């Protein structure tokens, strides 16, 4: 049984030191382009850890898509989905994103990135069915959202304060 969708504004826990994983290279599965989190400095970044086998991740991806549509696809909101299942590869991730119509950045998290997420924030970031997400604000501060599925409205409530700053 899937956990209920969170309808309350998610609580946010912030960290201010720039994490090392922001400098680690990722490869966008859809474009084959290399990027780092630091490439998005000055923008608001919504990061989700996921896996292609995870049904909650499909739901969460659909809600991220609705979020972008509701906000008019702003240039200063970037979404990144990091596949933390080391058994999955770039080709299968590309197929997954295409199949579901997800058009933001998808990357297989290298082991060092996955370890950093688990060590810095919590091992739950390596458990995709918990729908772990975080927001990186314009100043590079990391804000962790509560675990559990979040609908587009809840995500909008979480990101809008950072978009208006």
Each PLM stretch: what is its role?
Residues 35-58:
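Short active-site neighborhood of thiol/selenol oxidoreductases, capturing the structured segment around
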Residues 44-45, 77, 131:
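Alpha/beta-hydrolase fold active-site loops
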Residues 100-102, 111-160:
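Thiol/disulfide oxidoreductase modules built on the thioredoxin-like
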Residues 4-37:
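N-terminal "domain-start" segment that seeds a small globular fold
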Residues 1-2, 6-7, 163-165:
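Non-globular targeting/processing and membrane-anchoring segments
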Residues 58-101, 112-119:
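Structural microenvironment flanking redox-active thiols in thiol-disulfide oxidoreductases
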Residues 47, 78-82, 107:
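Rossmann-like NAD(H)/NADP(H) cofactor-binding core
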């Amino acid at each position: 049984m899937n956990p209920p969708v969170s309808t309350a504004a998610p609580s946010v826990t912030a960290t201010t030191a720039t994490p090392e994983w922001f400098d680690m290279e990722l490869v966008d599965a859809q474009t084959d382009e290399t990027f780092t989190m630091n490439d998005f400095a000055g923008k608001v970044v919504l990061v989700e850890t996921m896996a292609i086998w995870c049904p909650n991740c499909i739901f969460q991806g659909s809600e991220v898509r609705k979020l972008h549509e509701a906000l008019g696809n702003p240039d200063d909101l970037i979404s990144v989905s990091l596949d933390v299942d080391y058994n999955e590869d770039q080709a299968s991730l590309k197929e997954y994103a295409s199949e579901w119509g997800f058009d933001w950045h998808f990357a297989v998290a290298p082991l060092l990135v996955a370890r950093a997420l688990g060590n810095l924030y919590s091992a739950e970031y390596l458990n995709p069915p918990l729908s772990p997400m975080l927001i990186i604000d314009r100043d590079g501060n990391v804000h962790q959202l509560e675990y559990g599925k979040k609908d587009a409205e809840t995500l909008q409530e979480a990101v809008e304060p950072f978009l208006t700053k």
